Regions:
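Charged, amphipathic alpha-helical linker segments immediately N-terminal to NTP-binding catalytic cores
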Residues: 1-24
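Pre-Walker A adenine-sensing motif
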Residues: 18-37
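Conserved ATPase-coupling elements of RecA-like P-loop NTPase cores
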Residues: 22-25, 104-112, 126
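Pre-Walker A (Motif I) flank of P-loop NTPase domains
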Residues: 40-44
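Conserved glycine(s) of the Walker
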Residues: 51-54
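AAA+/P-loop NTPase substrate/partner-engagement loops
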Residues: 56, 60-108
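Conserved Walker
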Residues: 85-86, 120-136
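Structural recognition of the conserved hydrophobic beta-strand(s) that form the central parallel beta-sheet
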Residues: 97-99, 117, 133-146
Length: 146
């Protein structure tokens, strides 16, 4: 049977990190990036220096997450396409991660409000319908610090 520390090392190795290079605090920090995969509607923002693997886990580690890059999205793409009557990314993925969070914008003027409502309650309104989804939202971005 594995000890707690051995389990932590296994989890970190499964994401491509070598635990021997990290102290205990850093290991726990790296593990917190994975909370969104096991906890519904967990929302978090991680800021850090470039090239530290902030978005790697959401793009490469799990088939149940999607990384939205490029900064711009639509309410139809993210939440609900009313013309197709189809739920968007929050209904299809366990984790929706936004890369370069500083550049996020919506083409729709009500996009930010719908996102805030979803993050607070796990549901959103489109037309006459109230729709629930369990996706977690992660926001990752760079800071200008070495």
């Amino acid at each position: 049977a594995f000890t707690e520390n051995e389990w932590i090392d296994v989890l970190l190795r499964s994401t491509g990190m070598e635990p021997a290079h990290f102290n205990e605090r850093t290991k726990w920090h790296l593990l917190t990036r994975m909370i969104a995969f096991v906890e519904n509607n967990y929302n978090c923002c991680e800021l850090g220096p470039r090239g530290t693997g902030k978005s790697h886990i959401y793009k490469e580690v799990s088939p149940n997450s999607i990384l939205v890059s490029g900064g711009q999205t639509t309410v139809a793409n993210l939440f609900y396409n009313m013309s197709r009557r189809q739920v968007g990314l929050v209904g299809m993925w366990d984790v929706v991660a936004f890369d370069e969070v500083a550049g996020i914008s919506f083409k729709d003027k009500d996009g930010v409000q719908i996102m805030k409502d979803f993050m607070a309650s796990g549901s959103f309104a489109r037309g006459r319908d109230s729709i629930s989804a369990s996706a977690s939202m992660m926001f990752v971005g760079n800071i200008n610090q070495p």
